[in-house]
Amino acid sequence: MKRVFLIVLDSVGIGEMPDAANYKDEGSNTLKAAAKSEFFSTPNLEKLGLFHMDGLTDMANSKVVPQATYARMNEASKGKDTTIGHWEISGIISEKPLPTFPEGFPKELLDEFEKRTGRKVICNKPYSGTEVIKDYGKEHVETGALIVYTSADSVFQIAAHEGVVPIEELYRYCEIAREICKGPTGVGRVIARPFEGEYPDYRRTAKRHDYSLQPPRDTMLNQLKEAGYSVLAVGKINDIFAGSGVTEMVYTKNNAEGIEETLKYQKKEFEGLCFVNLVDFDMVYGHRNDVDGYAKALSYFDEQLPRFLESMQEEDILMITADHGCDPSTPSTDHSREYTPLIVYGNQIKGNTNLGTRKTFADIGSAILEYFNVPSRIQGESFLEECMKK
């Protein structure tokens, strides 16, 4: 029974890409930033080859012989956000970045949004999600106007107090925004950002919901589903692909939940892909420039990893990668244009095998399709033959 568990450590980049200057990300290295913290400890990832990848060998312990195949992944797409990164992993290289709005959204778009929702809009500028409710939360509660804001990413975010706008109503407003954000304003994601509490102590709740663009063409997920395989989505994977190609999904509130849900799926019988996103690295620590928090989150994942490895079946393959960077040590709170890691591990996978630097994240999707004997219609070149034991 063939199974692949593909785990995305959201934002765990491993060093600036050659074009990082075009994105104002020179010098970014998310993993090395976290490694400077006293709370950083990843012996299990190290055993799998994490520090033997291109660009990280100065961190390697020469006594450790990696038990897995490993590589450094280059992002071929233009952009550095979650949607673009996950789409590329699944076989779509995006020639254009998704639109961003550093000056806020155009008046015509917001006029239509106000007309359709019956509520006014406040803010309309790039903002930190925690700061925006501090600065606009009181006005929102008093007037009922929706806090609409963006970031350096391609997002249209709507913050609302759950006591003012019931959660289902907020989700409906997001669906309206998703309908009208198209063409030049076709953001990658519309995001519901509910919060609660009393002024000035507002806090975001865990009922965030993302409304993504449909992928422009079929991905690895669609091909696996068409071929009769299960495609299980853990965390925000279902949202990132707007449900396209997913056969079963479970939402999670944090990394701990994501790990537990993945372990539950590991115990179940299925044939196909379990695609996991662990978001805390990015959402809770990277964007908030919390180096120690980031290090603790990586250490926690590393602590839990043996639970998964010990329960792997004969035909299981584990792949660990990332979708972009988000260096918590730089002045920027935004994503960073970085290489990402790839670890491939399983009973059938060679140890101590370095695949070097791959041209595109899409090689991952191609390798997964080849493992399931599904002829690929996606971009990317499979590395499966290079890492399978003969």
Curated annotation (Swiss-Prot):
Swiss-Prot/TrEMBL keywords: Cytoplasm, Isomerase, Manganese, Metal-binding
Disulfide links within the chain: none
Compartment(s) where it occurs, according to its Swiss-Prot or TrEMBL record: Cytoplasm
Enzyme class, UniProt record, top EC level: isomerase
Involved pathway(s): Carbohydrate degradation; 2-deoxy-D-ribose 1-phosphate degradation; D-glyceraldehyde 3-phosphate and acetaldehyde from 2-deoxy-alpha-D-ribose 1-phosphate: step 1/2
GO biological process: 2-deoxyribose 1-phosphate catabolic process; 5-phosphoribose 1-diphosphate biosynthetic process; metabolic compound salvage; nucleotide metabolic process
EC number of the protein: 5.4.2.7
Coarse class of the protein's main subcellular location: cytoplasm
SUPFAM superfamilies, per database record: Alkaline phosphatase-like (SSF53649), DeoB insert domain-like (SSF143856)
CDD domains: PPM
Positions of Mn(2+) 1 binding: D10, D323, H324
GO molecular function terms attached to this record: magnesium ion binding; manganese ion binding; phosphopentomutase activity
Names of required cofactors: Mn(2+)
Catalytic activity entry: 2-deoxy-alpha-D-ribose 1-phosphate = 2-deoxy-D-ribose 5-phosphate; alpha-D-ribose 1-phosphate = D-ribose 5-phosphate
Cellular component terms (Gene Ontology): cytosol
Cofactor note: Binds 2 manganese ions.
Family: Belongs to the phosphopentomutase family.
NCBIfam families for this protein: deoB (TIGR01696), PRK05362.1 (NF003766)
Protein name: Phosphopentomutase
Species of provenance: Lachnoclostridium phytofermentans (strain ATCC 700394 / DSM 18823 / ISDg) (Clostridium phytofermentans)
Upper taxonomic lineage: Bacteria, Bacillati, Bacillota, Clostridia, Lachnospirales
